[in-house]
């Protein structure tokens, strides 16, 4: 069995986790108390994400950590309270106050040991641990500081195992904290060498998707359910049998041409409301084309200005290989999708026969087929550029820096992180002009 452990860190990580596990349970026919739904056939596919117990229940292979107890308390009293083992929900007593240094150096240090102990316990119960999925936000104190501390420890203890991130990136216009640019650049710098592949999501792009689904005022629940659908499509091939499945290491092999250039752009189609779905039946070609439209991207950036290095198309549901290959060939032939000269083929296709599932009360319609595109494109460097500019504006005045220094951080770490991000920006620039990134490790 190839098991995967999911780590949900900070408020965003835990709330996305809540939505994901709710969806996984429905997909695998697992009830909120961990028992199998008698109407669903028991297939072993659940065991890569769920651990079967001696009494016949299934427990998620997951750990949820937050430095303040509020969000985890709501899970402990919520609908799925019986699903998790109490040791899987670890909270501190005071939060990281949007401060990377608190999450990484002071408050985070107090709970890293119990968290690592729980991870070791879960890893020991696996037959063949494939790797870790880490869910967190860049902007929060716990999501940035504690996540990078944990990834540092994971690299030391489980060096060879894959580590994939699902990260909430600060949206261009919506900020949840003034110091988001600091936290984001510090965490990107610290995790750059530890993460094998990082899928970015920005709230603004998801807000727009929710509006397309007819949700006028999206709540975090709506946003997280959209993210959960996308994560489910990316992980479907790890959980269900399929004719062209993709495993964890295949993502890296096919999407990451250089170790640091590991931030694929994620797009998902179709995003249909129930009203629209009643009048539309989209073909494989149509949903594939839609994945290259800006409104279906998880991060705001202009792909026409960038070049593709690689693209992974993960189809699920009613799709046959011939249709998938034709759709891919047509996308490749389009002049707007430019590939770098040294990567002429550029497409990897995965097909999974299990169609997408939607949760009760969700705005999204149930469809017979969907596709998730993971594209490594130089256009995503726009996101780093925006963030670097915001960082520079604040750091030139040393604004808010004393909060970080007061928690044991050195001011030099800011400059070091910023230099690293400048190099990352430069690497993308060089690839765009068909040169190689500098100094390849």
Curated annotation (Swiss-Prot):
Amino-acid positions noted as binding GTP in the UniProt annotation, renumbered to this chain: 11, 68, 137, 141-142, 176, 203, 224
Positions marked as site (Involved in polymerization): 441
SS bond partners: none
Root EC class: hydrolase
SMART domains attached to this UniProt entry: Tubulin, Tubulin_C
Assigned keywords, A-Z: Cytoplasm, Cytoskeleton, GTP-binding, Hydrolase, Magnesium, Metal-binding, Microtubule, Nucleotide-binding
KW Cell inner membrane (keyword) present: no
One MF annotation (Gene Ontology) recorded for this entry: hydrolase activity
Binding site for Mg(2+): 68
EC number(s) from the headed UniProt entry: 3.6.5.-
One Pfam match: Tubulin_C
Family: Belongs to the tubulin family.
Protein name: Tubulin alpha chain
């Amino acid at each position: 069995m190839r098991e995967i452990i999911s780590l949900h860190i900070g408020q965003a990580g835990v709330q996305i986790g809540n939505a994901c596990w709710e969806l996984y349970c429905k997909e695998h026919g697992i009830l909120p108390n961990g028992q199998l739904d008698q109407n669903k056939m028991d297939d072993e596919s659940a065991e890569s994400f769920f651990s079967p117990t001696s009494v016949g229940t299934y427990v998620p292979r997951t750990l949820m950590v937050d430095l303040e107890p509020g969000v985890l308390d709501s899970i402990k009293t919520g609908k799925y309270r019986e699903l998790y083992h109490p040791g899987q929900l670890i909270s501190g007593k005071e939060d990281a106050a949007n401060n990377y240094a608190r999450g990484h150096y002071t408050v985070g240090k107090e709970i890293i040991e119990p968290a690592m102990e729980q991870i070791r316990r879960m890893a020991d119960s696996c037959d063949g641990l494939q790797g870790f999925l880490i869910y967190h936000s860049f902007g929060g104190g716990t999501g940035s500081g504690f996540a990078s501390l944990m990834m540092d420890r994971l690299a030391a203890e489980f060096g060879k195992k894959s580590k994939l991130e699902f990260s909430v990136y600060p949206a261009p216009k919506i900020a949840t904290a003034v110091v988001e640019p600091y936290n984001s650049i510090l965490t990107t710098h610290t995790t750059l060498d530890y993460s094998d592949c990082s899928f970015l999501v920005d709230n603004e792009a998801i807000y727009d998707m929710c509006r397309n689904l007819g949700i006028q005022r999206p709540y975090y629940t709506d946003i997280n359910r959209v993210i959960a659908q996308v994560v489910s499509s990316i992980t479907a091939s790890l959980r269900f049998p399929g004719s062209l499945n993709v495993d964890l290491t295949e993502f890296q092999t096919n999407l990451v041409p250089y170790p640091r250039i590991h931030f694929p752009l994620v797009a998902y189609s179709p995003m249909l409301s129930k009203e629209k779905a009643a009048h539309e039946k989209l073909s494989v070609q149509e949903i594939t084309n839609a994945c290259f439209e800006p409104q279906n991207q998880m991060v705001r950036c202009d792909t026409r200005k960038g070049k593709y290095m690689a693209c992974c198309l993960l189809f699920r549901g009613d799709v046959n290989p011939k249709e998938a290959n034709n759709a891919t060939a047509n996308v490749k032939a389009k002049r707007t999708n430019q590939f770098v000269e040294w990567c002429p083929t550029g497409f990897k296709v995965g097909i999974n026969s299990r169609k997408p599932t939607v949760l009760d009360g969700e705005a999204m319609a149930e469809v017979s087929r969907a596709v998730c595109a993971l594209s490594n494109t130089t256009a995503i460097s726009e996101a780093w550029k925006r963030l670097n500019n915001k960082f520079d504006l604040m750091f030139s005045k040393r604004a808010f820096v004393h909060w970080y220094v007061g928690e044991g951080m050195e001011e030099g770490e800011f400059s070091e992180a910023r230099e690293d991000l400048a190099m990352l920006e430069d690497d993308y620039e060089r690839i765009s002009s068909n040169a190689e990134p500098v100094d390849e490790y």
